[in-house]
Swiss-Prot record:
Glycoprotein is among the record's keywords: yes
Modification after translation: O-glycosylated on hydroxyprolines; noncontiguous hydroxylproline residues are glycosylated with arabinogalactan.
Entries under PANTHER family matching the protein: ARABINOGALACTAN PEPTIDE 1, ARABINOGALACTAN PROTEIN 13-RELATED
Cell compartments where the protein resides: Vacuole, Aleurone grain membrane
InterPro entries: AGP3/12/13/14/21
Protein name (database record): Arabinogalactan peptide 1
Main location (coarse class): membrane
Entry keyword annotation includes Transmembrane: no
Residues making up the propeptide: 41-68
Signal peptide range: 1-30
Tissue specificity comment: Expressed in roots, stems, flowers and seeds.
Functional description taken from the UniProt entry: Proteoglycan that seems to be implicated in diverse developmental roles such as differentiation, cell-cell recognition, embryogenesis and programmed cell death.
Membrane topology: Lipid-anchor; GPI-anchor
């Protein structure tokens, strides 16, 4: 029982690290990138960041479910 609890805590911690790391990578790449031209493509780039974070969280949750 204690082993299962420990593995679930580790899985949640790994998921949190993935979310924080993806957030930091997104912030760093946005800061390094040149400002986008004011076109319709700029909104597509802005919408991709939350989608990437959602996919990261979903992948971490699936990994936690499969391996715990």
């Amino acid at each position: 029982m204690a082993g299962q609890l420990k593995s679930k805590i580790v899985a949640v911690a790994v998921a949190a690290v993935v979310v924080v790391a993806s957030s930091l990578v997104g912030t760093a790449s946005a800061a390094d990138a040149p400002a986008p031209a004011p076109t319709s493509g700029a909104t597509a780039t802005a919408a991709a960041a939350p989608a990437f974070a959602a996919v990261s969280v979903a992948a971490a949750a699936l990994g936690g479910y499969l391996f715990c």
